[in-house]
Amino acid sequence: LADRLADAVAIGYDSLPGFGRPMARGHRGELILGMLGDIPAVMMAGRLHRYEGYRDEQIVLPIRLMAAMGAEILIVSNAAGGLNPFLRVGDLVVIRDHIDLAYRRGSYLSVGTDSPRYPSREVYDPGLIDVALAGARAGDFRAVEGVYLATLGPTYETPAEYRMMRRLGADVVGMSTAPEARVAADLGLRVLGLSVVTNVAKPERGSASADLPTTHDEVLAVGRGVVDKVCRIIDEVMRSGIV
């Protein structure tokens, strides 16, 4: 995605005070500034994760920096496991809401801001959700609304955990996104969340893939294959006049 920016300038996280270094493969650790059409944009090539030992305050620091730079919209994406039995590998799930099972007491909520400590609001912007779904229809590819569940990671879930998450109402599961999305909404940004379904959970014993492990290489391969879909949705957001 960062390759679509014109006049791009990349700044390594190691050059930015307070930024950590991503450890997950495929996460370069760069903040890239440039133009997306006629709109100034900042992209993160890599994110920090809780399972890497980073505190939520460190994970959301790039979001606070973007807000201070004048950002108005955050589009956040992730690779996720499909819990909903109707999902297929390669589908896009436009996040309607999330369940944060990895939240830790005293972390990122409203720290250092004047907003209420426990704000009650929609994290994901309904208008952006509608635009994203319209973009998928126009591009003739599959995208649905759903609930994202965040876990600590880095291990993938057991079959019993998959069943529990589905009963909680989650459609997809991953190891990121919730801290960034929540603090962005707390700072007044409009948030659009996109999950790429990179594997589908089939926890029932005897199902075709119940005993097949998910590998990080498989996740990366599927993620690379849906870049055009994500770009189409970003283009739709830009054309909509919301930006």
Task: Tell me the role of every PLM-derived stretch.
Residues 202-243:
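His/Asp/Glu-rich mid-to-C-terminal helical/loop segments that flank catalytic regions of hydrolases
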Residues 175-218:
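Zn-dependent metallopeptidase/amidohydrolase metal-coordination segment
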Residues 1-119:
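Metabolite-binding pocket within alpha/beta catalytic cores that recognizes anionic/polar moieties
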Residues 43-45, 74-78, 94, 143-149, ...:
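General beta-strand structural signal in soluble alpha/beta enzymes
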Residues 129, 134-171, 234, 238-242:
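Active-site/ligand-binding-proximal alpha/beta "capping" segment
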Residues 66-70, 166, 185:
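Non-catalytic positions within long, well-ordered alpha-helices that form the structural scaffold/packing
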